[in-house]
Amino acid sequence: MKTLLKTFLCLLLSTAIAKADGFKGHVYDQKTGEPLIGVTVLLEQTKAVALTGLDGSFEFKKTTPGQYTLVISHLTYKTLTQQITVLEKDNAPVNIYLSERNSKNLSEVVVAANTKASSEKTARKLEQKSAQVMNVVSGQAIEVSPDLTVANVIQRISGVSVERSSNGDGQYAILRGMDKRYNYTLINGVKIPSPDNKYRYVPLDIFPSELLDRLEVYKSLTPNMEGDAIGGAVNMVMKDAPNKLLLNANVATGYSQMVLDKGFTAFDAGGINSKSPYEAHGKNYDAGPKDFATGTLNYHNKNFAPNMVAGLSVGQRFLNDKLGIILAGSFQNNYRSTTSTFYNSSVVETDKYAVITSMVNRQYSEQQQRSGFHGKVDYAFNENNKLSLYSVYMNLQNLQTREGINTNFSNADYNGPAGNAQLSYESRSRKINQQIYNSTLHGDHKIIPGKLKLDWSAVFSSARNEVPDNTTIKLNGIRKNFEETPTTVSGSNRRWERNTDNDIAGYANLTYTAKIAGTKVDFTAGGLYRDKQRSSFFNNYVLKAVNTYGMYGVDFNDYTEIEWDVQNPKGAVANALTYDASEKTTAGYGMFKFKAAELEVTGGVRVEHTNQGYHMLFPRGESRPVGSQIYTDVLPSLNLKYEVAEHQNIRGSYFRSLNRPGFFEIVPGPIVQEEYQERGNPDLKRAIADNLDLRYELFPNHSDQLLVGVFYKRIQDPIENTIKADATRPQDVYYSAGNFGTARNYGLEIDYIKFFSKIGIKTNYTYTNSSITTDKSSRIRDEKGDLRTILVTQTRPLYGQSAHIGNLSLLYKDSNKGWDAQLAAAYTGPRINTVSQFVDNDLWQKGFVQMDLSIEKRIRNHFSIYAKAGNLLNTPTEIFIKGTNSKNADLPGQGEANETLIRKDYYKQTYLLGVRYKL
């Protein structure tokens, strides 16, 4: 790791200390004046060649005085020949301006357009010319970044942080401090469903980043966009067919440092039964021990666990460029290990802060197999009519073992100094398979060229989540004189879960262009209809050892030797997670857009009608086993853009948006999780927000930018998950969603990108401030001395919001020698991880810095080698309570002043070395 860092720093320093004895120059676009990257500059007399850097600059060193001919060439520009005179010293910079190739050569023009689709120049142009507030990460930037998934890429954008998964990688996006529930995800502008069994949000770690042309984040909405995005919307623009043959391939391998240090524990996933005995044999079947495979109990160490990444993209246009085809695929197989310490806690008596009751030391071993495939066929019948068919399939398989030792602090056997405690051992083997599929037939038609056009989409999407035979086994144990020993079997659970989400949708947009008072005005009307059908299934079997007194090491040596008895032979399908849900969304909108002088105006109104319902298949006395929510929302919006100068904008926008409840969130039954109980809330309402944005934009050239913006959100009935007490049994608590009055969220965003000759800087900073006031529990003694729980109000930030977020990336590019390097750091400030039932006992996640590195070297022809390293600083995830209880003072790991540690996870570094081919 130190060697990689030294190499990167040496690359940076070499630029600073190099001396120039010859002459320098810049190459610009003749029309826009923007610097051009990657232009070939040939010094004809000496055959020396230079490529322009990140700021369009080039340099020739040790050039003897005299007359020279420069030949300047680029794929998308006309080749230019220019005569220059080189003096002994004090040579003035040579400024060269290139014009684009002749537009009559349609092939080259289309190539240029497609070549630029994933470029930094295109990304900056989209941000500048867009009708709304947005940020873009180009495919070019993604390729040279350390990030392998979209979830990790998106954290580089201002105002965006990520929620990590159990292996330390990013998983969900948090936009502008608004929890993951407040944004939606698009592929090529089409909303996709979520594989989650309860909620709507899409895990972004399922998407390999190499399949993208660019990643767009919309921070304000226009009327032609769906309205359920208070935080914003994420759009993945996938690779499109180029004009000439595209052939890109890469393969890489690497390792996780934690796997090297701790090893990797695996189980036999091949024998897992995809269906529970209830499904396989019918509802009246009594399951026995032989119905449960032993593979999930067969743990073994894996001595060789390398990571592997591979990708392939092939595309071209045919039939005089009328037919375009592209196919792309990506496969990633990663092994990760995590070391975790978790503390269970409880607020007792009148204590202000929680008391730690037990500590669990866990070791995770996780194998992730991520595959993605997409293809697109488009055909242009003529210049006025075009059809395309796009399909994408994403699959993420996660095989995880989790082994834990629980130390009970509340038991009388606990004596820390003597090394005595009551223990419990828990092992869990789990397979999760998530899939997302989308197929979109799209048409573009110019009915009256220049006057009337129509575009439409017919969409089928599906998402699936399967967790078959999730196996947990528990043993009792004891620690005596610091020696830990498993003893007898406590029990086992075998759980099956699955859910499917199928969407059929249609979109249509009709645009009429008219001139009013000499100004061109676009009037657009359109609509959407989506029919969503969701099903969810849950079943759980409880197993008990036949020999309840059997001792580990005497009667059995591993889990496969235990004889089991099934306590509930028919299973437990009567659960709130066994339900059907549906949602029918109908929307229509009217939008206008015009530009008068320097002012561009885009506005209109959208109306969305929602019919969301659920049906519990096995109710257990709930008062509303079947229910629905029907409502209509009117969502106006207005986006203003004023061009202060050619490369400067001031934007202002207003839009109203909503956030619908998740599918399970309105199902009234309870489910029992490992550490808490969870319940739905059929009275949960949608949240409505009014959103304001103001942003100043400066684009001095095609690669540099300065963006300074502020935003304000007023959210009615925001949805927050909190821990609540049962109304009839206050000692029982559960986790549930609720609406909490009115919340306010405002902030500041700054983006800055600057490229010098070979060095570039990308940095952004976001400040976010929100407040929401909710009821919290507090315990007191009344006048009789009896313990009583009262409600008090407390104001806090929104769940998941960090006040401070920042990114800094240092880039190095030497086109002549074929070097690309990037050192990227992302800071996420403290944020609430879990909202507590009790006042002052919310769980917070500590602020953290994640640093990653990537280096690439072109070696010959179309080949390059690259290296990527993640989590260089071994940044942990730390969860804590802002306060301490004196009763926790002598417990292990509780040494921080004014903090109660609840969880601490370490992941260590990951390394990857690969080869890339680009035709």
How does the language model describe each region?
Residues 40-44, 73-75, 87, 91-143, ...:
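Short, acidic, small-residue-rich periplasmic hinge/interaction motif at the N-terminus
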Residues 827-834, 857-919:
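C-terminal beta-signal and adjacent terminal beta-strands/loops
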Residues 61, 162, 190-219, 239, ...:
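Short acidic/polar hinge/loop motifs at secondary-structure boundaries
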Residues 712-714, 732, 736-835:
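Gram-negative outer-membrane beta-barrel transporters
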Residues 206-252:
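A beta-strand signature from Gram-negative outer-membrane beta-barrel systems
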Residues 418-442, 573-586, 629, 658-715, ...:
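Outer-membrane beta-barrel signature, preferentially recognizing the C-terminal barrel domain
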Residues 191, 533, 557-570, 611, ...:
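Surface-exposed extracellular loop regions of Gram-negative outer-membrane beta-barrel proteins
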